[in-house]
């Protein structure tokens, strides 16, 4: 299959960026649905020199990309593919060799806190102190679901790396942005709730060498500054669905000054905001890295009639000249 003019432009950009001919080493590739994104990624990987990593959104896509890399004859020791979680986990295991993955890590921490407060209430010197401990235990138990959501989102937002995790204003912003307060079925002291979140978050970080959860796989290498094996290039697939922690880890993987980052995605398909992703993730990448932008907007998947309807929402998508007319 020959390269289209748009795909060839991506290849030329990669060559020029790696040879130092451009003022930036980052590219936002805006790839609309059915426009040959994966084919372009593979072709770009073939011309880039040195060691690289392709970051897939999930394991299934990572396995698909790995198979295509092998079919292209690319050495997996030179160009690897995986999720950013797997990349973070590999880096973290070099620091914490015996670390265990525990999905319910935060729940375990909350349960331990409640048990400790109950014990203190039972052994308190005065009835007043006992009541205070019992009240704190009740609050922690009541807010368990809220705290678990908030702490998970805070990890995905890279609290403790992009800013202090003890900054209460950032927690209030997170709570408002994701509508977490709406999940509460009763009135609570939000200052107290945030202080509880901070305590649980801090405790979780302190246990990272022994126990990590899914969110920690990315946050731990960032917050503890784990050494990454530096790459000459990193390609991020589905970049429109990245959160601050994923983006920070991808950047951390690059060789300083010479590493190239290509963020591939479709802002029109940014649908994972509820998981901590930014709806404007690609704009944020461009702002942070001063990225160039190139399009992949000629779709090979859809008939012209379907594309005409889709243009109501994505005006720049175009049907390939060989596409059938189709019926909507």
Enumerate the predicted regions with their spans.
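Accessory N-terminal region flanking or inserted into the helicase ATPase core
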Residues: 1-12, 16, 21-30, 40, ...
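P-loop NTPase Walker
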Residues: 1-100
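Short, well-ordered alpha-helices that flank and scaffold nucleotide-derived cofactor binding pockets
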Residues: 16, 43-50, 67-71, 219-226, ...
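Conserved helicase motor core of SF1/SF2 NTP-dependent helicases
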Residues: 29-41, 47, 57-64, 85, ...
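A generic structural signal for alpha->beta connector loops
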Residues: 51, 76-78, 230, 258, ...
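Phosphate/oxyanion-binding loops and surfaces in catalytic or ligand/nucleic-acid-binding neighborhoods
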Residues: 72, 94, 149, 153-157, ...
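A basic- and aromatic-enriched beta-loop-alpha substructure that forms the phosphate/nucleotide-
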Residues: 88-153, 159
């Amino acid at each position: 299959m020959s390269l289209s003019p748009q795909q060839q432009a991506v290849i030329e950009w990669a060559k020029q960026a790696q040879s130092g001919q451009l003022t930036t080493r980052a590219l936002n590739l805006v790839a609309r649905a059915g426009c040959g994104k994966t084919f372009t990624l593979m072709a770009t990987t073939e011309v880039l020199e040195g060691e690289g990593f392709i970051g897939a959104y999930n394991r299934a896509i990572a396995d698909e990309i790995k198979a295509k890399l092998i079919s292209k004859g690319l050495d997996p020791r030179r160009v690897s593919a995986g999720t950013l979680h797997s990349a973070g986990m590999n880096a973290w295991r070099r620091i914490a060799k015996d670390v265990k993955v525990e999905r319910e890590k935060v729940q375990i921490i909350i349960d331990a806190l409640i048990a400790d407060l109950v014990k203190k209430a039972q052994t308190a010197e005065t009835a007043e102190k006992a009541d205070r401990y019992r009240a704190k235990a009740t609050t922690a138990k009541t807010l368990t679901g809220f705290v678990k959501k908030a702490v998970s989102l805070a990890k995905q937002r890279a609290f403790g790396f992009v800013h202090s995790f003890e900054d209460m204003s950032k927690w209030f912003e997170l709570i408002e942005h994701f509508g977490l307060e709406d999940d509460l079925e009763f009135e609570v002291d939000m200052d107290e709730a945030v202080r509880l979140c901070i305590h649980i978050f801090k405790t979780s970080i302190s246990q990272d060498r022994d126990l990590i959860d899914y969110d920690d796989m990315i946050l731990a290498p960032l917050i503890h500054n784990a050494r990454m094996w530096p790459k000459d290039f990193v390609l991020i697939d589905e970049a429109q669905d990245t959160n601050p922690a994923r983006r920070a880890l991808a950047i951390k993987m690059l060789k300083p000054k010479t590493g190239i980052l290509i963020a591939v995605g479709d802002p029109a398909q940014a649908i994972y905001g509820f998981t901590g992703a930014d709806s404007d993730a690609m704009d944020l990448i461009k702002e942070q890295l001063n990225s160039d932008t190139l399009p992949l907007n000629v779709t090979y998947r859809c008939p012209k009639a379907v594309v005409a309807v889709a243009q109501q929402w994505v005006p720049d998508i175009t049907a390939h000249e060989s596409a059938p007319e189709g019926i909507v």
